[in-house]
Design a protein with these regions (language model features):
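Acidic-enriched catalytic cores of C-N bond-cleaving enzymes acting on peptides and small amides
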Residues: 207, 216, 223, 237-239
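Short small-residue beta-strand/loop micro-motif enriched in glycine and branched aliphatics
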Residues: 132-137, 232-238
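Short, Lys/Arg-enriched N-terminal segments with co-localized hydrophobic residues
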Residues: 4-18
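Fold-independent oxyanion-binding glycine-rich loops
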Residues: 103-105, 174-175, 202-205, 228-231
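Flexible glycine/proline-rich, aromatic-decorated loop/lid segments
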Residues: 213-229
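Acidic/histidine-rich catalytic neighborhood of metal-dependent amide-processing enzymes
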Residues: 140-217
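Acidic/His- and Gly-rich active-site-bordering loop/insert found
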Residues: 20-141, 158-164
Length: 239
C-alpha cells in the first residue's frame, strides 16, 4: 500500500506535465495553425471544374509540404488517373497499432456566388447566434479542409511534444467531391503500404456544435438505372 501511495502521485504528476506541455505548444502556435488553415482555404480546389485544375494540384502540394513540416516521413504526391493522393507516414514501432487518417483536399463548387455573404475563397471569421465564439466562413472550412488539417496539426503537436503513441499514416485525396473514382484503385495497388488497425475519417458529422460525435459508419454511393413499365389503360389509384 505504501508503494502504491507513492507511485500514483508520480503518474499523475507526469500526466499533468505532459498536458501542460501540450497546452503550451498550442498556445504558442495556435495563431500559426489558424493562418495556415486560412491559406489552405484560399485555394479554390474545385475538383468538379477543370478550370480549377491548377489550383487542385497546388493544394496537393500544400498538403504535402505541411505533412513534411509536421514530421511525416515518405511523403509523396501519388499520381492517379485524376487528381493525386497525398500520402505520408510516421512509423515509430512495428509493435504499435497503426492509425490511417483519411481526408480530402478538394471542395465543392461555390455557386451560386450571390448567396454568399462573403467571397467563398476569402475566409472570414465571424460570430453568429449558432457560433457565438466565432467560426470560419469559407468553402471547405468544414468539408473537408478544416477537419483534415486539424489532424495534420494534431500530428505535429504530438511529434513536437513527444506524445505520439502509435504509428500514423495519412491518405488525403483530391477527388472526394466527384465520387473518388481513383481511390479504390489506389488502395488496392497500395494495400501493403496502407495497412492499419483503424481508419480515422475526417469527413463526418456532429450531433451539435457543442457535442463531439463519433460516426461508426457512412453511406456509400449507388448508381442505378430504373425502367418502369405501366398499364396500357387508366387504372384507379388503388389498383
Amino acid at each position: 500500500v505504501d508503494i502504491a501511495i507513492a507511485f500514483f502521485p508520480t503518474l499523475a504528476f507526469r500526466k499533468n506535465l505532459i498536458m501542460e506541455h501540450i497546452k503550451n505548444y498550442i498556445d504558442q502556435h495556435k495563431d500559426r495553425f489558424l493562418n495556415e488553415l486560412l491559406d489552405l482555404l484560399k485555394i479554390p480546389s474545385v475538383s468538379a471544374d477543370s478550370a480549377y485544375a491548377a489550383d487542385v494540384m497546388k493544394t496537393a502540394e500544400f498538403v504535402k509540404d505541411k505533412l513534411i513540416a509536421a514530421g511525416a516521413d515518405k511523403v509523396e504526391v501519388c499520381p492517379t488517373a485524376g487528381y493525386p493522393i497525398v500520402y505520408g507516414e510516421k512509423i515509430i514501432s512495428p509493435n504499435l497499432p497503426t492509425v490511417l487518417v483519411y481526408g480530402h483536399y478538394d471542395v465543392q463548387p461555390a455557386t451560386p456566388l450571390e448567396l454568399w455573404d462573403t467571397p467563398p475563397f476569402e475566409p472570414t471569421i465571424r460570430k453568429t447566434a449558432i457560433h457565438p465564439e466565432g467560426a470560419i466562413f469559407a468553402r471547405g472550412s468544414c468539408d473537408d479542409k478544416g477537419q483534415m488539417y486539424m489532424h495534420v496539426k494534431a500530428f505535429e503537436l504530438m511529434m513536437q511534444t513527444n506524445t505520439l503513441a502509435c504509428n500514423v499514416k495519412f491518405m488525403i485525396e483530391g477527388e472526394e467531391e466527384v465520387g473518388s473514382s481513383n481511390l479504390g484503385i489506389f488502395v488496392k495497388a497500395n494495400k501493403e503500404r496502407l495497412k492499419a488497425d483503424v481508419v480515422l475519417i475526417s469527413d463526418t458529422s456532429i450531433l451539435a456544435n457543442d457535442l463531439p460525435s463519433i460516426d461508426c459508419g457512412l453511406r456509400g454511393l449507388s448508381y442505378v438505372e430504373v425502367e418502369v413499365t405501366g398499364p396500357n389503360r387508366d387504372l384507379h389509384s388503388g389498383v
